[in-house]
Amino acid sequence: MRTRVIVNGANGKMGILACETLENHEQFEVVAKLSRQDNLGQSILDTKAQIVVDLTRADCVYENSLTIINHGARPVIGTSGLVETQIDELTKLCKIKQIGGIIAPNFSLGAILMMMLAAKASEYFSEVEIIEGHHQQKLDAPSGTALKTAEMIAAARKKPKNKLPLKELTLGARGGSHHDINIHSLRLPGLLARQEVLFGNIGETLSITHNSIDRRCFMPGIVLACQKVLNLTNLVYGLEHLL
């Protein structure tokens, strides 16, 4: 028996590839391909979907996630834009419902390894900044990957960090700050997804960079998330917990 999956946001570039990947996988059956005009909750009931892969937009991902959980399906969220308070609320809801779920700031396994390496390196470097770049159709900033990277670094850091008393001559010149880590966001044609984590110590720097050059790099992570989520009874934030 194949696992029944809905792809929400199926008409986008990521959604089209996700549908193609899951349809060609022996473990899954794509029972609905939804776009913004479709009723997500009703589709879950009609198809008895076990998993909903959400690849929509930042302005609707929270409501979509609530709908998925409240209708008894397991969310696999690949849409950025969720803030920490929303993730906390979704975590509580999954616990109450005893439903597994996954929020993946990035489905690329290479990007996950980059984040894990950055967290490890932060134990030995006192200073770090994040530079992320995406295509111009990505309208939220910073990226979910950058936010998650900052959170992983902040959790792992042992050395004190300096907050330099600089005066910005142009507002925002030093980027935004998340967990006291500066993040700089680029939105340029020619980019798909790129992130550099740049560390500095006295007399040396260390750069950890990941480039996504084709959206197909995200597909193994989507398959992994759909395979693992059925065995979860809680919400997991980040694919690094599944590797």
Question: Which residue stretches match the model-derived regions?
Answer:
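C-terminal substrate-binding/catalytic lobe of Rossmann-fold NAD(P)-dependent oxidoreductases
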Residues: T3-T47, S126-L243
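Rossmann-fold NAD(P) dinucleotide-binding segment
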Residues: L45, I51, L55, D59-G78, ...
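Rossmann-fold dehydrogenase core element
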Residues: R74, E89-S108, S126-V128
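Structural motif
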Residues: N8, L55-T56, G78-T79, A104, ...
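Short, ordered loop/turn segments at secondary-structure junctions
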Residues: R36, S80-L82, N106-S108, G133-Q136
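Rossmann-fold NAD(P)-binding glycine/threonine-rich loop
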Residues: T79-G101, L117-K120
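Rossmann-like NAD(P)H-binding beta-loop-alpha module
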Residues: L113-F125, A141
